[in-house]
Amino acid sequence: MSLLSVIFIALGLSADCFAVSIGIACTHASIKSRVIWRVAGTFGLFQAGMVVIGFFAGLSVIDIISAFDHWIAFGLLLFIGVRMIYEALQGEDDQELVKLDLTRGLGLLGVAVATSIDALAVGLAFAVEETNIGLAALLIGLVSLTVSFLGFKLGNRISFMASRWVGVAGGLVLVFIGLKILAEHTLGWDILL
């Protein structure tokens, strides 16, 4: 998988982190920089870690699935992307999550796991595509950290409803990457991304 594809996947995966960061920023009057860095760093670490876990889980079954690899990668990315779009359009009331402090402890752990579950399946897709997992995990972690940080910084300036469309955009990116993988393997197209 190309570096550009990995970057787009990283951006797609980071959409949930961005939306949650905006939500947290919108519900806290003022957040100290160290808290922002702690939350953004945790999001980045969990995204990278889940990709690695998914990758190595995928390697254990690679011989069995090599004949269907492109369909599996497409299906996983399509499922994740469509689920992200669906969840974004559902308009779940994130205000209910604020009852628990999402900037530390169990609240932070819970939201970090929730925003990184998709990365687990992407790690499996990376194993199928024989992607350089070290570079992919590093990029996904750094992009998630950066996007989360930006979400916090922009949270007070952006309407809370905007986070819904960020989730839709992230889902569409993952669906597009899935379609790209399918086209490359079934039609022999060499798509730049």
From Swiss-Prot:
Protein name per Swiss-Prot or TrEMBL: Putative manganese efflux pump MntP
Predominant localisation class: membrane
Keyword annotations: Cell membrane, Ion transport, Manganese, Membrane, Transmembrane, Transmembrane helix, Transport
Top-level taxon in the UniProt lineage: Bacteria
Record localization: Cell membrane
Entry similarity comment: Belongs to the MntP (TC 9.B.29) family.
Task performed by this protein: Probably functions as a manganese efflux pump.
UniProt-listed HAMAP family: MntP_pump
Cellular compartments per GO CC: plasma membrane
Gene Ontology MF term list: manganese ion transmembrane transporter activity
Membrane topology field: Multi-pass membrane protein
Coiled coil segments of this chain: none
TM segment ranges: 6-26, 48-68, 71-91, 108-128, 132-152, 165-185
